[in-house]
Amino acid sequence: MKILVFEYITGGGFNKQDLPEALKNEGRLMLQALLDNLRLQSNHDDLSMSVMLDYRINGLINTDGFETVVINPEHNSHNEFVNLVKQCDAVWPIAPEFDGILQKLCQSVETLGKTLLTSPASAVALTGNKFETYQRLKQHHIATVPSRLFTGVVWNKNNEVQALAQELVESGITDVGIKSDQWLVKSVDGVGCSDSYILTSPHDFEQMCSRQGDYIIQPHIQGIKTSLSCLFKEGTGWLICTNLQQFNIINQQYQLSELIVNYDLDLNCYQDLVANIAQAFPELWGYVGVDLIETPAQILVLEINPRLTTSFVGIKAALGINVAENVLQLVKGEPTLTSFCNQAITIHMKQNDSN
């Protein structure tokens, strides 16, 4: 099997413009971890592998065992991607959901009839939209944070804001952990925290209304911010580990400062949630990250990321599990997920990195 790996940020997706620093750092981490996983697996299976690299990243990634295709400024990165896909059997894209980037890559692979080693374009379209994800979660009675589309919301006078407050009460979320008169606004298709804002005053709402783009608004709920690293296939989910996310709040925005992979060794309280998500989102396939916020009342689903997340970087060291090996197993059957160790691994993030 010949596999193409394309991490959008470090692989040439920004070859005609400056690399976004935060996304570049995260992309390098995930790309290196994936190449390391695949390299180990190639020692056992008959695999040949190619990777696309931005000309500014070439030499900064260990690509031993991979055919490296350098993308220069004069290249059309999408055309190069399509041409390389035609030469491969399977493709593993890593890309942000914003502007439909990941969805378009997945659709290209599917159109060319190649094996996609991630969730299909249909799953990316759904989970890449925070409001549609919220609606699907509500439809399947999975606890989530009440959300509305942000459309010219007026401070404390808008029916949608009042409806959010009422939904909090109806959902059984207690006042513990809820910031009165604080709201969180997020880009509908944004990645991480880069386009999310905490609103605390009428002036904040006025400023937010002047921004371009589509946003959702949610009550600002305080709690333990965790994530799940999972595998999914056709309505079945496998939980790999839980992760703890530590944030700083700078200029009314959350910024991920530290990530503890496999922080909670007891996975029992999350197993039913993973099974419910698998049933609610049967489109999901392969590695998926699920962002949560845990309050004294319940565990709430914040987002579903149909791609590799930063937590993936620490899984091999934390559990000895080769995620790439298990994703390849999904192509023909079920993953083994055999762990050889069980420890927490801390990843310190540079300022502005996201998950």
Regions from the language model: what does each represent?
Residues 285-291, 337-342:
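Flexible, glycine/charged-enriched surface loops at secondary-structure junctions
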Residues 334-355:
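Cysteine/selenocysteine-centered motifs that mediate thiol-based redox chemistry or coordinate metal-sulfur cofactors
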Residues 298-300:
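Conserved protein kinase catalytic/activation segment
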Residues 218-283, 294, 305-332, 346-350:
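ATP-dependent carboxylate/phosphate-activation module, predominantly the ATP-grasp catalytic core
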Residues 48-159, 163-166, 171, 175:
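Conserved N-proximal alpha/beta basic substrate-recognition cap immediately N-terminal to
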Residues 19-38:
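Short catalytic helix/loop segments, enriched in acidic residues and glycine
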Residues 123-224, 233-235, 259-275:
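Active-site nucleotide/adenylate-binding loops and adjacent lid/helix of ATP-dependent enzymes
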Residues 1-4:
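Extreme N-terminal starter segment of soluble prokaryotic enzymes
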